[in-house]
Amino acid sequence: MKRKKTVIHQLISEKQRFEKAKEGGNMAAKDDFGTTKYIIHAEFEANGVVERPDVVGAIFGQTEGLLGDDLDLRELQKTGRIGRIKVEVHTKAGKTYGTILVPSSLDRVETAIIAAALETIDRVGPCEAKIRVIKIEDVRATKRKYIIERAKEILETLMEEEIPETQELVEEVRKAVREMELIEYGPEKLPAGPHVPFSDSIIVVEGRADVLNLLRHGIKNAIAVEGTSIPETIIKLSKERIVTAFTDGDRGGELILKELLQVADIDYVARAPEGKEVEELTKKEIIKALRSKVPADQLLTIVQQRKELFDKLGRERRRGGARKQEYTKKGSLNPQPQVHPNEKIVKPLKVLKPDYKEFEEFIEKVKNDSIALLIDENKNIIKEVPIRDMLSAIESSESIYAVVFNGVITQRLIDIVSEKGAKYLIGARKANVVRRPITLKIITFAE
């Protein structure tokens, strides 16, 4: 009677364990196999209907004491060397079939011994049974295979991502530096290079991108108008500095240039190549365009001459048409067409003023080299200095007859040159001059 109670109690305990394992589901199984090295895969067949607890009980019961204390399944499971045994069963035609999974963290030899011990089980519950080991799975090999496949995927993803080239990294750093160098100038906060506040000459461009492109190539005295409406800051700067208008080679650039020439005092005009914008020019194209700049006065003269030529041609055509109609009315009924020789329009030569002609050679020299020349009465060059050193050179020199330079004639310069007793002051253009000494003759390149 006591033995019967013990068996019933054991069956109840096995059933509770089965229900608990069933509730845990796959997660429990995953936890059991998480730290194992090997998994024993076996299948069984029983000549009768048995349940999972019967199979588990047979495994523990029939291997107890078979392999000694060191390989006893109960002791190994307590110490975690053997994981939870997973059994799946299904019944068909009065027989029970199923699979057994035994997780093991033992070494290969000990795991193989446990696997062989499973095949010694010949009964499950009241039924005869047979267990056959299919394979021993090396979990670490499976993990290694997973690691290799996953590493391939990660590497492929990494290689698909765009890795910036060295030049791109350098360009990113330079771009950040250029944007740091960019300043806001004037009440309108116009984008400008860092040299605009103190440079003697400035370059007026259309927009912020143009200023950044010039900064990229080392030109730091550019300022943008930011639109077709010319800011007051640009107008004010044009009266104090030597200004070069650098516009795009399209219709928009022409409109901005036209507006600049109307409201500001522009000294030189440079254009980007036809169809290109300043922001997309290379360093070579920028340098070439700036070297090819033309004086604004010369550009305006050409435009004015063309306008006068077209007006003259229009007047002659209108007069010729009127004479032809008048002759037809007053002449015979069948007037003969009058043949006129082709008339050539000859552009009158520009007559140089005596004073300008006297210094023409020196003017051409400073135009090309952007220097200042101090000349004595015999037309000998006393000093040849950069424009930035011109004032100090004048103050330290004697017997100055004329000063020729490619810059703006200011009131201060007039006063200094006059004090030195010079007779001529020749520059690119004049600023707002209030006092003009009688003994000093002031000439601009346009004159």
Curated annotation (Swiss-Prot):
Q: Keyword set for this entry? A: DNA replication, DNA-directed RNA polymerase, Exosome, Magnesium, Metal-binding, Nucleotidyltransferase, Primosome, Transcription, Transferase
Cofactor binding note: Binds two Mg(2+) per subunit.
Which Gene3D superfamilies did the record assign? 3.40.1360.10
**GO terms for biological process, alphabetical:** DNA replication, synthesis of primer
Catalysed reaction, written as an equation? ssDNA + n NTP = ssDNA/pppN(pN)n-1 hybrid + (n-1) diphosphate
Check the UniProt entry and state the signal peptide residues, or none.
Answer: none
Origin: domain of life: Archaea
All copies of domain Toprim, residue ranges: 200-274
Q: Give cofactor(s), names only.
A: Mg(2+)
EC number, as in UniProt = 2.7.7.101
The entry's Mg(2+) 1-binding residues are 206, 248
InterPro entries of this UniProt entry? DnaG_primase (IPR050219), Primase_DnaG_arc (IPR020607), TOPRIM_DnaG/twinkle (IPR034154), TOPRIM_dom (IPR006171)
Pfam name, any one = Toprim_4
Where in this protein does the record put region Disordered?
Answer: 316-339
What GO CC annotations are associated with the protein? cytoplasm; DNA-directed RNA polymerase complex; exosome (RNase complex); primosome complex
Q: What class of enzyme is it?
A: transferase
Residues the record lists as binding Mg(2+) 2: 248, 250
What are the recorded GO MF terms, alphabetically? DNA-directed RNA polymerase activity; metal ion binding; poly(A) binding
Summarize the subunit comment.
Forms a ternary complex with MCM helicase and DNA. Component of the archaeal exosome complex.
Instruction: Spell out the family assignment given in the record's similarity comment.
Output: Belongs to the archaeal DnaG primase family.
Q: What is the documented function of this protein?
A: RNA polymerase that catalyzes the synthesis of short RNA molecules used as primers for DNA polymerase during DNA replication. Also part of the exosome, which is a complex involved in RNA degradation. Acts as a poly(A)-binding protein that enhances the interaction between heteromeric, adenine-rich transcripts and the exosome.
- NCBIfam families xrefs: PRK04031.1-1 (NF003108)
Entry protein name: DNA primase DnaG
